[in-house]
Amino acid sequence: MHQTTIVKKETVDKKWYLIDAANVPLGRLSTLVASTLRGKTKPTFTPNVDMGDNVVVINAKEVLLTAKKDEKKIYYHHTGYPGGLKQITAKDLRQKHPEALVEKAVRGMLPHTALGRKQFRNLFVYAGPDHKQMAQQPMKIEVK
C-alpha cells in the first residue's frame, strides 16, 4: 500500500532564483515571486511547511506599472496617532524606495501568518542590477 509522504522542513531542497524586473508588469512579476516563495511550483507542496525557494529580484526600479498607475495608485499607512493616515503615490514611492513597490505587492500575495512572514524573508529585492547573493549562484528565471 502507498503512503502519502509528509514533507518536513529538514527534507526541503531550497534553491536560489534570480528574476530581472526590468519592463515586467508588477502583477505578473509578483505572482511568480509569491508562488516561488511559497513553494507552489514544487510537486510536493505542503501548505503548512516553509518549502519555498529564495528569490532575488534585480532592477526593481524599472518594473512596469500599466494604465497610469504611477500617478493614480496610492499606498496608505497609518502612524498610530489620531489623524495619522499617510499616503504616497506609486511614482513617489518608486523615487524614495524603488524596491518597496515589489515588496508590497509580493507581501500582499503571501499568507498573513507567521509562516508568511518567514517566507517573505526569503525575498531579496534590489533597485539596480547588482546584488549580494552572487555566492549562492541563483538560476535566472524569465517572466512571461
From Swiss-Prot:
The GO annotation for biological process reads: negative regulation of translation; translation
Family annotation (CDD domains): Ribosomal_L13
**One Gene Ontology term of the molecular function aspect:** structural constituent of ribosome
A Pfam family matched in the record:
Ribosomal_L13
What GO CC annotations are associated with the protein? cytosolic large ribosomal subunit
Concerning InterPro entries, the annotation shows: Ribosomal_uL13, Ribosomal_uL13_bac-type, Ribosomal_uL13_CS, Ribosomal_uL13_sf
For this UniProt record, give its keywords in alphabetical order, as a comma-separated list: Ribonucleoprotein, Ribosomal protein
Q: How does it assemble?
A: Part of the 50S ribosomal subunit.
Q: Which family does it belong to?
A: Belongs to the universal ribosomal protein uL13 family.
Describe the task this protein carries out.
Answer: This protein is one of the early assembly proteins of the 50S ribosomal subunit, although it is not seen to bind rRNA by itself. It is important during the early stages of 50S assembly.
Its recorded name reads Large ribosomal subunit protein uL13
Give the classification, highest ranks: Bacteria, Bacillati, Mycoplasmatota, Mycoplasmoidales, Metamycoplasmataceae
